[in-house]
Amino acid sequence: MSDPLTHFNDQNRAKMVDVTAKQVTARTATATGTIRMQPATLDRIHAGTMKKGDVLAVAQVAGIMAAKQTSNLIPMCHLIPLTGVDIHFTDNNQDTITATATVKTKHVTGVEIEALLAVQTTLLTIYDMCKAIDRGMVIDNVHLVEKDGGKSGHFQFGEAPESQA
């Protein structure tokens, strides 16, 4: 069995994994996370009355931009040509917004980190745009929901490890 910690060389120092021999395949990753806030904050987001502008539109663009910049921010991530990034929002009409990012590529390595970074940046942007009226917002439950493609195959959050490829 090979060592699962592939980002270390034979001197136990960090390295970028060599993906030269890997096959190009279609790959998709979806991540999600939530931000909890005061009900009045969510009401103002819905009403479009935040001084900084359309919170969800700006957060959506920020998340897309973040996915495209992943290799500049996470040292061992490869520069991956993304073929799609989509951010969706849902909320409970009370105090929570959920952001979900789906990232796609046709490349030799996956886009899980791109999806996770997109979600985190989306949620941080919501925080930034609303912090003047609600500094008690909480970002949580950020995780990979699903990934598909590549040698490791399909992953679905919550599946038992033995059923994952």
From Swiss-Prot:
Pfam families: MoaC. The keyword Ligase does not apply. Pathway: Cofactor biosynthesis; molybdopterin biosynthesis. The keyword Lyase applies. Belongs to the MoaC family. It comes from the Bacteria. Homohexamer; trimer of dimers. GO terms for biological process: Mo-molybdopterin cofactor biosynthetic process. Its EC number is 4.6.1.17. This is Cyclic pyranopterin monophosphate synthase. InterPro entries: MoaC, MoaC_bact/euk, MoaC_sf, MoCo_biosynth_MoaA/MoaC, Mopterin_CF_biosynth-C_dom. Substrate binds at M76, C77, H78, I113, E114. It catalyses: (8S)-3',8-cyclo-7,8-dihydroguanosine 5'-triphosphate = cyclic pyranopterin phosphate + diphosphate. PANTHER family: CYCLIC PYRANOPTERIN MONOPHOSPHATE SYNTHASE, MOLYBDOPTERIN COFACTOR SYNTHESIS PROTEIN A. Catalyzes the conversion of (8S)-3',8-cyclo-7,8-dihydroguanosine 5'-triphosphate to cyclic pyranopterin monophosphate (cPMP). Keywords: Lyase, Molybdenum cofactor biosynthesis. It comes from Limosilactobacillus fermentum (strain NBRC 3956 / LMG 18251).
